From Swiss-Prot:
GO terms for biological process, alphabetical: response to cadmium ion
Signal peptide: none
Matches recorded under NCBIfam families: CnrY_NccY_antiS
Pfam families named in the record: CnrY (PF17524)
InterPro entries: CnrY (IPR035230)
Keyword annotations from UniProtKB, A to Z: Cadmium, Cadmium resistance, Cobalt, Nickel, Plasmid
Record function comment: Component of the NCC cation-efflux system that confers resistance to nickel, cobalt and cadmium. May be involved in the regulation of NCC.
Gene name of this polypeptide: nccY
High-level lineage: Bacteria, Pseudomonadati, Pseudomonadota, Betaproteobacteria, Burkholderiales
Family membership: To A.eutrophus CnrY.
Identification of the protein by name: Nickel-cobalt-cadmium resistance protein NccY
Length: 95
């Protein structure tokens, strides 16, 4: 530790140069350009709402699709005793 005085002088120069007014001005400018905490929170809330809406629409679409497929694929007999309404046999065979 022979050069402790020299080290302290160098440390003082570095500290003084780092705390000069133009450096602080640049830091303040940069901080002023950054969004505030309220803006960051609002962005986070909007992102969460969009993700929730997308997930809800996906779940709703899947549920509606399953219900529609279940209704569409009901088992119906295809023999002549139970003709479809569009069939001409429906006119010949009464209910």
């Amino acid at each position: 530790m022979e050069n402790i005085d020299e080290w302290l002088v160098q440390a003082k120069k570095v500290t003084y140069e780092a705390s000069r007014e133009p450096g602080l001005g640049r830091i303040q400018q940069r901080l002023s350009r950054e969004p505030s905490q309220m803006v960051l929170t609002a962005r986070h809330d909007i992102l969460r709402a969009v993700c929730c809406a997308a997930l809800a629409s996906l779940v709703a679409f899947t549920a509606i699709d399953r219900i529609a497929v279940g209704l569409y694929q009901k088992q119906q007999p295809t023999w002549v005793a139970a003709p479809s309404a569009a069939s001409p046999f429906g006119l010949l065979i009464g209910k």
